[in-house]
Regions:
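Zinc-dependent metallopeptidase catalytic helix centered on the HExxH motif
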Residues: 96-172
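N-terminal low-structure segments adjacent to metalloprotease catalytic domains
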Residues: 1-36, 41-53
Length: 228
């Protein structure tokens, strides 16, 4: 009996791992638009053009974008689906599978209204979220997998913020004051990265090649924005 239970468990585990590696087996509806492939288990959005055109324009302006790159966006229909396909990953608006670079969008992605929402109710433009997710994907494709898994999240968040244009709701004084307001950490990391790139006369790809120190970026940020 124990062997049967164990074998059953192995079958379930194997099926789960297969779905993580090939989510298209579950999210069986898809449509291609520009540089994107949208996948869903249920109904696909009727008019994704506005969001995807806006995101595509920003993505194509990245110094680590190469023609021919495509981005797979998977629309989850509920919190359980979002968690099931992104174990051990974090992200309120999106999560990127490091194995296959698939982007899982949080439930509630509204293409018609260009709105994305976290479980806590924090809103952002969906086009900005898609752009930010693409920044993570392009970084993943640019560096070695182990480098991606061990590099500082501040670099990923910072570049995603710069490429997406942010939300426009914060200023440097907010970043200096700190706090736990939704979106503030992304904005602050964007300032850190922006300051470092400008002072060193670098583009993001240069930084990926040579590496970056958060302590150094923090010093530059405080000197320029916080008075010391």
């Amino acid at each position: 009996m124990k062997k049967i239970v164990f074998l059953f468990f192995l079958v379930l585990l194997g099926g789960y791992v297969l779905l993580l590696a090939k989510p298209e087996l579950y999210f069986d509806k898809s449509v291609d638009y520009g540089i994107f492939t949208l996948r869903a288990r249920g109904e696909l959005p009727a008019s994704p053009e506005g969001v995807l055109n806006s995101a595509g324009d920003r993505i194509s302006g990245s110094d680590i974008y190469t023609p021919g790159q495509r981005f797979e966006l998977i629309l989850t229909s509920g919190p359980w689906e979002y968690r099931l396909f992104t174990p051990f990953l974090k992200g309120g608006f999106f999560r990127v599978n490091p194995y296959n670079a698939a982007v899982f969008l949080a439930p509630g992605a509204d293409f018609a209204g260009d709105k994305a929402v976290t479980a806590s109710g924090y809103l952002r433009s969906l086009s900005g979220v898609v752009t930010a997710a693409a920044a993570w994907v392009m970084t993943l494709r640019k560096v070695m997998p182990l480098t991606y898994l061990t590099m500082g999240d501040w670099e990923l968040r910072g570049y995603a913020e710069l490429l997406s244009g942010g939300t426009g709701e914060f200023n440097p004084a907010d970043a200096c004051a700190g706090g736990d307001r939704p979106g503030l950490e992304d904005y602050r990391d964007g300032l850190l990265l922006d300051r470092l790139l400008k002072e060193e006369n670098l583009v993001y790809n240069d930084l990926l090649l040579r590496g970056a120190s958060k302590e150094d970026a923090e010093r530059r940020f405080r000197r320029n924005y916080c008075g010391g």
